[in-house]
Curated annotation (Swiss-Prot):
SUPFAM superfamilies the UniProt entry points to: Translational machinery components
Similarity field: Belongs to the universal ribosomal protein uS11 family.
Name assigned to this protein: Small ribosomal subunit protein uS11
Region Disordered, annotated ranges: 133-152
GO process annotations (BP): ribosomal small subunit assembly; ribosomal small subunit biogenesis; translation
Length: 152
C-alpha cells in the first residue's frame, strides 16, 4: 500500500447558466413573482415549476437609502435588471404572480408593484397571465394593537 491518495477532479455543474435553445419566434416562459410590500419590492423570476430561481433582484439592491427601497423608481430599476438577465438566459416571456403582504398585513400591493410590471413589459418581455396571489386569511389570528377598538 502506498501512502498516496487519488485526487478526483471536481465536477462542474451548471444550473440554468447556459442559454435555453429556441427559435427566434418561440416564446420561452418563466414566472415572475413580484412581492410588493410597503418596505421593499422583490422581483423574482423562476422556471415554470417555480422550483429553480433564474434571477432575483430587490428594490433595496438598487438604491442607497432605506426609505427608497419600496419606491417605484427602485422597483423599475430592479425589473429592468431582471429583464436583462432573463434575455441573456433565453427567457422571452413571463407569467406574473403579484403578491402583497397579506395575512394580518396589508392586502393591497405596495407602490412598486405597478411600476415593476410596467418596466418588465417596456423592456421587451412578453407578458402571459397576471395573477394576484396575495394570501387572504379565512379566519386569521388577532391583529396587532387592539385594532380600531374603543373609539368614542
Amino acid at each position: 500500500m502506498s501512502g498516496k491518495k487519488e485526487v478526483k477532479a471536481p465536477k462542474v455543474v451548471e444550473a440554468l447558466s447556459a442559454k435555453i435553445p429556441c427559435g427566434p419566434s418561440e416564446l420561452v416562459f418563466g414566472v415572475a413573482h413580484i412581492f410588493a410590500s410597503f418596505n421593499d419590492t422583490f422581483v423574482h423570476v423562476t422556471d415554470l415549476s417555480s422550483k429553480e430561481t433564474i434571477v432575483r433582484v430587490t428594490g433595496g439592491m438598487k438604491v442607497k437609502t432605506d426609505r427608497d427601497e419600496s419606491s417605484p423608481y427602485a422597483a423599475t430599476m430592479a425589473a429592468q435588471d431582471v429583464a436583462l438577465r432573463c434575455k441573456e438566459l433565453g427567457v422571452t416571456a413571463l407569467h406574473i404572480k403579484l403578491r402583497a403582504t397579506g395575512g394580518n398585513g396589508s392586502k393591497t400591493p405596495g407602490p412598486g408593484a405597478q411600476s415593476a410590471l410596467r418596466a418588465l413589459a417596456r423592456s421587451g418581455m412578453r407578458i402571459g397571465r397576471i395573477e394576484d396571489v396575495t394570501p387572504i386569511p379565512t379566519d386569521s389570528t388577532r391583529r396587532k394593537s387592539g385594532h380600531r377598538g374603543r373609539r368614542l
